[in-house]
Amino acid sequence: MKRRLTNLFDELPNSKKSLETNFEYGISVSRNLKGKIREAIVNVPTLNFFGAKIEKYVKNVLKNELKNTFKIDKAKNILIVGLGNINIENDSLGPKTLERLIVSRGLNLSPSVCAFAPNVQSNTGIETYETICQISKIVSPDLVVLIDAFATVSVSRLCSCFQFSEKGIAAGSGNNHASKIISKEALGARKVLSIGVPTLIYASSFAKNISNKKIKEEFNSFPMLMLSPTDVKKNVELISR
């Protein structure tokens, strides 16, 4: 069950309040700071080429966005949710990221960080939205971070683009089974930050890059078919770090 960041376009809209920053290794950051809701895209087109060699550099760029654009360092009580199915490689980004977290809730440390992976409704019989809402009532976080893999319409963004949004996530929207939006209003938190990386692309979108008419028609005949890179397992392992 795939999800897309709610109302977050593959290309951020041009705006006087949109800022773009370029870094080494072809990394670029586009920000939409219009209004109260902030969005950002960190595009790392060379990630699949350089891999672990630029891991530390990419981490620093991402940390900069989290701290300076989204101000998460001000949060004292943080709930981190790893969305997705750990048993499916292209949907396991959320749960795998949680494996690398330092959980401090109950240790008298600040900030207090707790984490959980709700799995998917097809495995649990419980809607993800309902699970997160109930956990949020128990924890009472001022910041909820939702980490997920999702679908994209652009081949160039596969496993190489980090998208941030304060709008929340509608679980299942990537495959037309969307439920209620997991937002700060629904969870009663001061802020909800969604972090997503595309690991799948629709066959119809992929077909736009194919010149062979017959093959293109075959892909277009399965509009809801989703494809992922053959090395998606390696990419998810790298991104989750």
Regions found by a protein language model. Give the residues of each.
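N-terminal amphipathic/basic leader segments beginning at the initiator methionine
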Residues: 1-37
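Active-site cofactor/substrate anionic-group-binding motifs, chiefly glycine-
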Residues: 27, 31, 55-74, 87
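Helix-enriched interaction subdomains in cytosolic or periplasmic regions
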Residues: 34-59
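Short glycine-rich or small-residue beta-strand-to-loop segments that form or flank ligand, phosphate
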Residues: 43-45, 77-88, 115-119
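A glycine- and small-aliphatic-rich helix-loop capping segment at beta-alpha/alpha-beta transitions
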Residues: 65, 89-106, 161-170
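Gly/Ser/Thr-rich loops at beta-strand to alpha-helix junctions
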Residues: 82-93, 122-123, 149-153
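Catalytic-core regions of hydrolytic enzymes
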Residues: 112-144, 149
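A structural signal for small-residue-enriched, beta-sheet-centric alpha/beta enzyme cores
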Residues: 116-117, 146-241
